[in-house]
Amino acid sequence: MAGTIYLYVFDTMADWEIGFLTAELNSGRFFRKGLSPAKIVTLGLDKTPVTTMGGLKITPEISLAEWNLQNTKALILPGGETWLEDTQKPILEMAAECLKENRLVAAICGATMG
């Protein structure tokens, strides 16, 4: 699977919603023969550690400012309690750019409201 899959992480992220997806993308065990597992990179508005709804602390690997749309295979937007807040506008704008460039955007649960 060419390109990188970016997982957006943020305070209040619903950490349980990404478990099956990230496990299968990372392992590639159910991919068609010949396809390699996906590279998943955590992406944050900045590199400040976030706290998920389940209390996990995650430090984003890259910030939104460092993100390169050109090597993006997909963007995963997990659910959470802050999707209607102004703080999410920058990632929603980037998600719109992904869609314009025919990149996959996977919005889960609360992320569909953004």
Positions of predicted regions on the chain:
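Short, thiol/selenol-centered motifs that function as redox-active sites or metal-ligating centers
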Residues: 108-109
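Extended, subdomain-level signal for the structured scaffold at the beginning of enzyme domains
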Residues: 1-101, 114
